[in-house]
Every structure is written in C-alpha cells, then in structure tokens.
Amino acid sequence: MFRLFSSGVDDLVLVSNPSNGEVTSQIGARFDRELIYTNIGEVLIAVNPYKALPITGPEFIKLYQNASGSDASPHIYALAERAYRRMVDENESQCVIISGESGAGKTVSAKLILQYVTSVSPNNSSGGGIGGSGGGNGGIPQYDGGSDDRPSPPMGRGMGMPGMVGRGGLPTRGGGPPSRGGGPPPTRGRGGPPPPIPQNRGAPPPVSNGGAPPPVARGPVAPPPTRGAPPTRGGGPANRGGRGGGPPPVSTSRGGGGYGGSSKTVDVEHIKKVILDSNPLMEAIGNAKTVRNDNSSRFGKYLEIQFDDNNAPVGGLISTFLLEKTRVTFQQKNERNFHIFYQMLGGLDQTTKSEWGLTQATDFYYLAQSKCTTVEDVDDGKDFHEVKAAMETVGISRDEQTEIFRILAAILHVGNIRFQGEAPASVIDETPLQWAASLLGCDPTFLCQSLNHRQIQSGSARHTQYQVPQNPDQSAGLRDALAKTLYERIFDFIVARVNKAMSFSGNCKVIGVLDIYGFEVFERNSFEQFCINYVNERLQQIFIDLTVRGEQREYHEEGMKWKDISFFDNKIVVDLIDGNKPPGIMRVLDDVCKTVHAVDSAAADIKFMEKLIHSIQSHPHLVISNTGSSADEFTIKHYAGEVSYSIEEFCFKNNDNLYASIVGCLQNSTYQFIVSLFPENIQDNKQAPTTSSFKIRQSSSYLVTRLSACTPHYIRCIKPNDKKQPMNFVSSRVEHQVKYLGILENIKVKRSGYAYRQLKDIFLNRFGKIMDVQPRNVQEFVEYITRTHKDINADEFEEGKTKIFVKNPETIFVMEDLLMQKIDPIGYKNRVQAYKENEKLAQMKQGKHSMKQKCLIQ
C-alpha cells in the first residue's frame, strides 16, 4: 500500500531465473545502493556494510511499528516487528536464529532485534495491548558496520558491526612459546612483593617448594560442575556462585531471587534496562579482538525475553555455551585476551592497581604474548566505567565488583609464574606467585604445591590419595588450568547475576534471539573450531529442516500437489561428528579419553587418530590424507567447505579436567567469595569423566529443543569481503556464502510453494471477522473475499487436510488491512496517518546522508 520507491529486487523470490550467480548480483545491486537487507519471503539476508548507515533510530522504529508487512522494504526492524506481532496475535513463543560466518554481523543484528522489541513493547505489565510507549531506551544508534571495536555501550551510544572470528594458533599445555614451561617477558619493577595475605582460615601448614601438599579431604567427592541445567520458568533457589547443578553444559542459572513473582510486581522498565545494559557487560567478559574483528564474540548466547499476557517484557533468561576458555591463557599474534582485562588495567584507580600489583598490559604474559594490547579508537578505561555501571544495573554490588576484579588481577599474576628443574618443578621467580596467592587469599606455599603436584586417587576400595610430582611443562599446564577455571567461574557468576536481575516465575511467552560463533576456518584449526563448526552444522540442519525439508514434507502431509526440490542435506555431516551407530568422531574421542585418560596427552592424540583411521576413514565427508604413524590431522567436508583439524591436544581439551589440588587450594581461601565459587569436591581420575564433547552435544541438543519450541525467524548474515573494507562487495566471496547457506534452494521452494499456512479453525477465527457473519468453512470465506475484493483471486488459496495455504504474502497483507478496518476503523486511520508522518521523518534523515538514495522504506 505504501511502497513508494523501488531499488532493485527486494525479495529474491521475485527473481525470474534464480541461480547462485544471479542471486549474488541482485544482493550486490542493492548493496551498491546501501540497501544491505534483502528478503527471501520471510527470511532476511543482511550484508555487513562495515560502515555507519543511518537506517536505525527512533524514526525508523516508529515507521516499522506502524507498518504492515506490505508497507516496508526489507529491514531487521520489519523482521523484529513480525516476530513481536506474531507473538501477540497468535499467543505463541518466537525465536530469531541469526547465522552466518565469522565477521558477517550477527551480534549487531541481535542487538537491533532487542532494541526494537524493548522499544515497541509496553512499559508496564498492568495494562497494555500491543505497542506501548516504548522502552525508554534513549536514542537508537546508527547501524555501524565498520567500527565494532569495543563492547556495546548502553542504548544511546554508538555501536558497531561485530563478527565472530577465532584465532588460528592454539595453546600448548605449557602455555605456548617461548617455552613449554610457559614464560612471560621479563617483568619490570612492581614495587616489591605483595602485602601479606590475611590470616588463612584452615590452610595447611607450610611445606617446602619441592614437597608434596597434604591431601585435600573434604568428604565424599561430587561430580564436577557443569555449565548449568536447562532453565525453568520458576527460576529456582539460589546456589553457590550461581552455578546450576544439572547435566547440560549450558550456563543458565538465575541465582535465585530477583524480580520473580507475578507480572503485577514486575518493574518492566527495569527489566528493559537490564536486557539492554547487560550487553556491554557480557561483551566485556565474553568478547575479544581477533585478527579479523575487534569485538568478536567468543561464546554463544541465547537470550529469551519473557512477556506476560499484556505483552510486556517481564523477565529474561540468558543461556551461554562454548566459552573459549583457552583465550585466557593463549592468543595468536595480533589478537587480544578478553576485553575485561584491558578495561580493568585502563580504568582502575592507581591506588587499587598498586595494592594489586597491576602495571601495564605488556608486563603480563597472558596479555603480552600476542604482541597486541591496544585497539585503534578504543578507550579501554572509558569502557571499564560503562561495564561497572552495567554491573550495578544487574545487581552486582560494589563489594562483589571488587572481588571479581581482584580475581581477574590474580589471573594475570598466575600467568607470570614460570617453572624450572625436574619434577617437582620449582618456581623461577617468587614475586608473581606471592601476588597471585595474596589476591586469591591462599598460602603461597600451598598454591605452589598445588601447581607442582597433582593429586591422584587410587582406584582401589580404599580410594587412597597420593601426590604425583609435576615437571615444568605439567606445572605450566596446571597453572593455565587454574587461570581458565577462575575465569570460567567468574563468567558464570556474572551470567547468573544477569539472569537473577531478569528472573520471572509466572506464565509467559518468549522471543528468543540466538547469537553464536560463526563458522570458522583458519590456517590451523583445533578442537575449538571443531566444536564451533559442529554447532553451526546443527543450526544449518535446523534451517534446512524447517525452511526446505519441513515445508516440502508439510505439503505432502496436507495432500498438496508438489514436486520435491533437491537440496544438500547436511545430516550426513552431523552424523559423522556426533553419530552413535556407527560412532561419530566425538564418540571415538570420548572412548579414547575414557580408556587412556591417564596417559600422556600426545599418546592419547595418536591413539585417537588410529581409531579414526580404523573405524570411520571410509566416510564420504571425512578425509585422512596421511594414514601412517605420523598422521596428525583429519579433514571434514562441512556444509560450508572443507576444514582440516590438527589433532594436537584434542584429548587434553576434551577431558577438561578440574584438578583436586587446585580446587582444594581455592576452597581454603580467606576470601569467602572465592570459596563460594568452588562448592564442589573433586577427584582427578573419575571413572567416567564428563568430556567437553559430551557437554557440547548436550548443549546443542538443548538449544535445538528450545528453538524448536518456538516459531522461527531467520537472519542470514553475509560478509562482503575478508578485510572489513567499507562497502566493498567481492562477488566471488559472497557467492560462496550464498551457495553453502542454501539460499538458492530456499528461493526455489518459496517460489513454488505458499507464503502463508495456518490451521483452518485459527484462520477462520481471525480473518472470518472481515465478514458480517462468521463463515462456516474455508470455501465460504474464499467465495466471499474473492467476490467482494476483485484484486484477490481464488487460486491464491489452497485447502489442505487440516490447513489453509495462501500463495502470495500480498494477499495476507490485504486481508490484514481489511481486518483492521473492520474491527478498529479509527485505529486503522490513525495508523495510516502515523505511518505517513514517520515515513517523512525517516526520508529526511536518510536524505541528509545521501542525495542519491531516496529512501529505504519503499
């Protein structure tokens, strides 16, 4: 109705002779006009512009809020509007699945979805309907594709266009070069050793550097902590450190309390603020600079916004998975550790830094090893204060903030501990050990012994505990395990606090937004890329199942005339990785880890490769070029292309052990906050250890279950070039993504199929209101609508066994307008008027940016 301007084909379903090349050309033609969004029916294609575009903001939110599906050109706000309205109209949960490779712009797309939904939803839960006064979110930032170089600030500030790019190099057990023992650069003066630590509560008596620490005896041994149980609407009681106790490796714990209760007691504006302000906090602890992106997400996040019966956001839940813990101890050249370390060094006051022995990033091995400690145009100190403000918003007290930053400071000192000699290894320089012990509230001798001895429990009935001295390499491995464990517990604590601040226990609908690592392939790929790409295979499987296979299956089940369209089914790749019969790669890996977990890591990796060659070498999507004794990599033919994986440390990383000596040391800390982060008891050689691959299979299945319970909406993000160059469209690079994302197959199904389908009763209950008398059946409605409205043809409708199908979306748009005119004529008139006014404002805003481009809204 209001399609005023046209620039190219805004819906690829309209392409006459679709091919991968033609689709790429159409996307490129729009991109050249700074139109970064294109539709495939209801699937949105989003191309990263790597520059700021004035296509977001309050004017555009109002414009899309008041527009029906026929009113607006492709835009992420249009998709967000559709998801929100469907939740309202159909009373069903929705989800937005954002996919694409690293650097394609998934994270900023997720932010824009959240901004739109919090803006258009009511500000209170006691009254409402749809489209309240907005979320009090201040100014909405412009779409910036080229400068996503710091954690996203709260609303009203600038934002960037991140991707999710990983590192190529990976850590060794000793922490990488310059030696297997790990090794920071020579430290500059830090003003002497740290102050004495507080009186240790119950610490063991001091022993010499070379001796064995006393065994940790704290009662029955509990299984290691997992990353939390699947969420429940009720939130559940608080737990120590906010770590859930269920098996799935997804961090979702709410920590209890918060804003739980009925919707009548919920401060909706506070919930909106938590949802938006948690972004810079989550990015600070979960994002990092990589070689291809200055703000790369190094974890997966699924955020569910919970809505009450009045469609107001009354709660939320963040589920996290696949945190890249190895980044704490190793980054490849020109990458950085997680943002929070640099922010802390840049933002803490000098007194606190002196008390904690903090100087500059180049003095700490965990930050200096990559030769990159700063990012252009990023003020880490300024970002630190924004992060602290976000912590206050989510209910992390100032005392708790101090505890968190003290632990982060301790991690930096832990990284500077180096070892030498024979087993048990001795510490080269006591200063970083003293600082780490002081900040962790541990006896320095006990901490040292926890690193140069590993506690083992015998498999006999007596379960005798004994100490195994560690050489420098092994001690460095324990040192890095300590650092990664501390960081993971802090990460989970913060996630739990964010969830506590959004906790809601009433009945609700949700809109979920998935932001996860993109597909990764580098010169050197290891266990991390293997896991990331497996999850992306699962997400691609969901997309294919719901948009291609599922749609064709539905036509057959409904008795429709349909000729199947061929497509690549990546189930064969998923089964290669996680299959049970025959066993997939993960099952083979777990089996090796169970049988040889006490053996040297390198020997375990060799055994893993031998079993791969023996059991699944013949698989059509697995390539093992070298099958001899020196075989050290395998290649998987993924849906997105071939990736070769180095087997080095596959078994070590898959075991992901939590060592008893380390836990025992931290459980004896004088700081109760640290003790609360480690409530469990642990033994090293559990009979059936929980492996990383097992956790990943569980978390991906959990995620698939959550997504499958919602009506899905898809955003397919595309990276136009590999150098982050603004408005540079490399056709060959884009066409490769168009091909492996299955966009062409999706277009063909949409062109041959139906844009809308609904159960007959629901359809008649809604659109039957257009008639003066409720129709008795679909045929009666079709006869009426085609007789009274000449622009609607009878062949637009097809009746299946249980559902009614409509071929073109324009028909639905017309019927929606007719329905609004019938049930709310005044509101419809006001909506049209508001649309026209907002359209003028949007055109004026964009006109200032470019005289050549008339308007995004057509």
Curated annotation (Swiss-Prot):
Coiled coil: none annotated. One of its GO terms (molecular function) is ATP binding. Residues 7-820 form the Myosin motor domain. The keyword Cell division does not apply. One of its GO terms (cellular component) is macropinocytic cup. Residues 126-139, 157-182, 233-245 have a biased composition (Gly residues). Residues 121-265 are annotated as: Disordered. It is found in: Cytoplasm. SMART domains: MYSc. Residues 712-722 are annotated as: Actin-binding. Keywords: Actin-binding, ATP-binding, Cytoplasm, Motor protein, Myosin, Nucleotide-binding. ATP binds at residues 100-107. Pfam families: Myosin_head. Residues 183-228 have a biased composition (Pro residues). One of its GO terms (biological process) is phagocytosis, engulfment. Its main location: cytoplasm. Residues 821-858 are annotated as: Tail. The head domain possess two actin-binding sites, a classic ATP-dependent one and a secondary salt-dependent one (located inside the GPR domain). Myosins are actin-based motor molecules with ATPase activity. Involved in phagocytosis and motility, and in the maintenance and dynamics of cell cortex. Belongs to the TRAFAC class myosin-kinesin ATPase superfamily. Myosin family. This is Myosin-K heavy chain. It comes from Dictyostelium discoideum. The gene is myoK.
